[in-house]
Amino acid sequence: MPHYTAPQPVVHLAELVLELMGDADLNEVMAMEEASHAHPWTRGNFLDSIAAGHWSYCMRAVDEIPKRIWAYCILLPAVDDLHLLNITVNPSMRRQGVALRLMQAIESIASNMQIPRILLEVRPSNHAAINLYERVGFTHLATRKAYYPLESSSGQREDAMVMVKTLELPPKTYEH
């Protein structure tokens, strides 16, 4: 029987990097936001977050030209919490492990900055997101009543699950 070597994969998950989000990214970010959310953030929301100093990142493939945004996130650092305000994966990149990689990067940021907890809100109807968050160690902390608007114009609202992950931080090192 002949010996066959495995072919190189046609599709592979490239090396991904986080880069600071800037004004030049907003057209692509807005297209992703509007394609992904029933009630998307506005351009003003993103500009305000960047101006306020929220940690705003775009995830891109290192070797891709032109460099598309694969995902983005907006993080609000506080004393002992890193609040994940917005996380979105490019619709064409979903189901490829990008969200997992972004969550791992967010956890690494929190750990490097000695922030022991990551908080987020998620719609209870967003089963895919909840499954991901639970898979990476988030647990249900609380419920915010009537937090999200529903897709209809009825004025009804959906609760938010508040989820949290407490990190095992390395000991602080002090320089003398």
List the predicted regions and their residue ranges.
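Conserved catalytic-core motifs of GNAT/GCN5-like acyltransferases
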Residues: 2, 119-121, 134, 139-162
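Acetyl-CoA-dependent GNAT
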Residues: 2-4, 11-12, 17-94, 100-109, ...
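Acidic active-site catalytic centers that drive phospho-/nucleotidyl reactions
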Residues: 25, 126, 159
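Positions that flank functional sites
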Residues: 48, 125, 147-148
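Short Asp/Glu-rich motifs
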Residues: 52-53, 129, 152-153
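Short amphipathic alpha-helical segments
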Residues: 87, 131, 145
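Conserved glycine-rich acetyl-CoA-binding loop
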Residues: 90-104, 112-113, 117-118, 124-131, ...
